[in-house]
């Protein structure tokens, strides 16, 4: 979730590789799969008022634009992914665990700085 929010609102927090990947997606040269659970978590955080300077309406506009774009397909949260996530209990946060499970199932990298996911060797 952090990577997506940083891209939308605080790109200076992204590393160079992430900035390049997002730039490629914006230019139509790459595709970034956005797990539905990331959208749900971002909405939850915005509703709680935990994103300084970001209103829920503003976030919804960004998310709708991404959903309408071919460059940011939303991947559904399927029961199979939820069940398979039990194998990744090394990741304590359920949202992060579901993101990793989905990425592994789709054979796509996880774009994150999360140290737990990185230490588990499950991130790019």
Feature annotation, model-predicted:
Residues 121-124:
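Active-site regions of enzymes building and remodeling cell-envelope glycoconjugates
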Residues 53-60, 68-113:
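Active-site neighborhoods of divalent-metal-dependent phosphate/nucleic-acid chemistry enzymes
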Residues 3, 38-39, 81, 99, ...:
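Alpha-helix capping/helix-boundary segments
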Residues 34-35, 77:
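Short glycine/serine/threonine-enriched helix-capping/active-site loop
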Residues 6-7, 43-45, 82-86:
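A short acidic, helix-capping loop that chelates divalent metal ions and anchors anionic groups
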Residues 2-34, 48-62, 106:
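Short, well-structured N-terminal submotif of metal-dependent ribonuclease cores
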């Amino acid at each position: 979730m952090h990577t997506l929010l940083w891209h939308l609102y605080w790109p200076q927090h992204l590393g160079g590789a992430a900035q390049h990947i997002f730039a490629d997606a914006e230019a139509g040269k790459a595709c970034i799969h956005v797990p539905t659970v990331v959208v749900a978590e971002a909405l939850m955080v915005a509703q709680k008022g935990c994103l300084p300077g970001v209103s829920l309406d503003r976030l919804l506009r960004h998310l709708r634009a991404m959903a309408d774009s071919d460059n940011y397909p939303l991947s559904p949260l399927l029961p199979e992914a939820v069940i398979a996530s039990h194998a990744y209990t090394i990741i304590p946060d359920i949202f992060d665990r579901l993101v990793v499970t989905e990425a592994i199932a789709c054979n796509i990298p996880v774009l994150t700085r999360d140290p737990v996911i990185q230490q588990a060797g499950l991130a790019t």
